């Protein structure tokens, strides 16, 4: 059998194939266009949202609750945002850590089991996690290190799907087995992410390769920093801030795209590895998990074009240029401002901002922090004025998270993977909830708005396109 030397074909090197693909692409773009007015005519809830942008009710959950309004005399009044995990306010969960160093493991327990653990229960759970927090040298060598690339989310999906083959009961979707799989994946995902990044650095950037095992007795946040850094050192505040960031990103209701993906895929009866890989694929999308990267890129642009970061008028003038599509990426967006649910404040942003300030003080980066605060204050007002909005606009958690990760020395390639590490406990809790309350497969309706046509036999079809002959080109390339 004659096989190609290339996994993917470079169209620029094959003229006739490139021409044929351009013809096919043009045909595609000339079809599949649906009249936007039809969505209004048939009252289609695009994005599963109503005309006001609120998500339509598609399910019930006890895992988390997101609130942004108070009901006063039957009217919804914007309020400070609140977030509850299994009924507990996120502010209380964070403030309750004053006597403890880290809280992400306790948050995982709470999300999975619906109750706060006792000291004995938490220690037992940490021991279980520690037993799972390992990858064999064979897996690291044969899976993680193969086909490394800059997209760590892609590598994580591949590794998760490959772990299926190492599981003696991969297709068992009983709640008991899925719990075991979930805890194991929660424990292994930080290793997969960090090792995939080191593999990328070594094989794609020709940098020194080092793989460090996690240390038993350390928190997930501590082990991430230990495995990531060449010298394996970190300060207590650095580990604490990362731990808080993981807690704040762990869960946010059943309707966000990646968690809803968990529900949709789980309802089909598929395995845990496929479900987690699908949710990672959702989170990878720039409309979902990549927002903090956009915020960082935007601030890099602001720092370049604004000479005096403390000059409110100069900063405001440049933000107006961004909103008018005259600067940065010409999208007209101030990234990190606004949220689909929150109005007056995003509680995650409020908490993370407090810890970002502490970290900026330790790192000597208060000048940058002050710029973030200024853009946050000005951006809220400018967006409301520009969009003529009556709903308040607040900064969301993505506004400060990228800045925090940068101060922690976490590379941009790991920003979204860190989000995945934080969110997999939430996905796991929702998968278990879907299984334990097994209903029907999720299948919303789509209305056909095309036209029925009479079949035309081949000789009578209109030859609307002429495809170039590729035989000659294939002969030249030996394919």
Predicted regions span which residues?
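Non-transmembrane, aqueous-exposed alpha-helical and coiled segments at domain scale
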Residues: 4-479
């Amino acid at each position: 059998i004659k096989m190609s030397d290339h996994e993917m074909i470079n169209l620029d090197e094959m003229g006739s194939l490139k021409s044929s693909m351009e013809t096919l692409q043009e045909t595609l773009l000339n079809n599949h266009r649906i009249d936007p007015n039809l969505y209004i005519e048939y009252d289609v809830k695009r994005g599963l949202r109503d005309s006001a942008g609120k998500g339509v009710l598609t399910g019930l959950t006890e895992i988390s609750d997101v609130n942004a309004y108070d009901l006063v005399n039957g009217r919804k009044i914007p309020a400070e945002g609140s977030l509850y995990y299994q009924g507990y306010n996120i502010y209380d969960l964070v403030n309750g850590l004053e006597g403890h160093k880290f809280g992400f493991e306790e948050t995982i327990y709470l999300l999975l089991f619906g109750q706060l653990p006792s000291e004995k229960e938490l220690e037992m759970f940490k021991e279980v996690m520690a037993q799972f927090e390992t990858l064999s040298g064979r897996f690291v060598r044969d899976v993680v290190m193969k086909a490394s690339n800059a997209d760590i989310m892609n590598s994580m999906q591949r590794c998760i799907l490959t772990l299926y083959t190492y599981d003696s009961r991969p297709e068992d979707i009983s709640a008991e087995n899925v719990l075991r799989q979930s805890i194991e994946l929660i424990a292994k995902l930080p290793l997969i992410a960090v090792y995939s990044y080191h593999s990328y650095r070594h094989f794609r950037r020709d940098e020194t390769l080092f793989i460090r095992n996690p240390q038993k007795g350390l928190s997930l946040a501590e082990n991430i920093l230990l495995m990531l850094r060449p010298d394996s050192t970190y300060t207590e505040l650095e580990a604490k801030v990362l731990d808080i960031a993981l807690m704040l990103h762990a869960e946010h209701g059943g309707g966000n795209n990646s968690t809803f993906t968990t529900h949709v895929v789980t309802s089909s009866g598929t395995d845990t590895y496929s479900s987690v890989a699908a949710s990672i694929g959702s989170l990878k999308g720039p409309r979902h998990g990549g927002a903090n990267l956009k915020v960082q890129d935007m601030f890099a642009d602001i720092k370049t074009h604004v000479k005096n970061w403390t000059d409110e008028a100069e900063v405001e003038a440049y933000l107006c240029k961004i909103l008018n599509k005259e600067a940065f990426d010409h999208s007209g967006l101030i990234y990190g401002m606004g949220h689909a649910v929150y109005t007056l404040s995003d509680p995650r942003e409020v908490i993370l901002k407090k810890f970002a300030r502490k970290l900026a003080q330790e790192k000597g980066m208060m000048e940058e922090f002050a710029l973030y605060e200024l853009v946050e204050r000005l951006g809220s007002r400018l967006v409301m004025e520009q969009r003529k909005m009556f709903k308040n606009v607040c900064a969301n958690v993505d506004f400060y998270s990228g800045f925090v990760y940068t101060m922690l020395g976490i590379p941009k390639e790991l920003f979204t993977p860190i989000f995945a590490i934080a969110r997999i406990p939430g996905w796991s809790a929702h998968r278990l909830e879907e299984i334990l309350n097994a209903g029907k497969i999720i299948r919303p309706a789509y209305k056909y708005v095309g036209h029925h046509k009479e079949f035309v036999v081949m000789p009578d079809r209109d030859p609307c396109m002429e495809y170039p002959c590729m035989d000659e080109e294939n002969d030249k390339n030996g394919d």
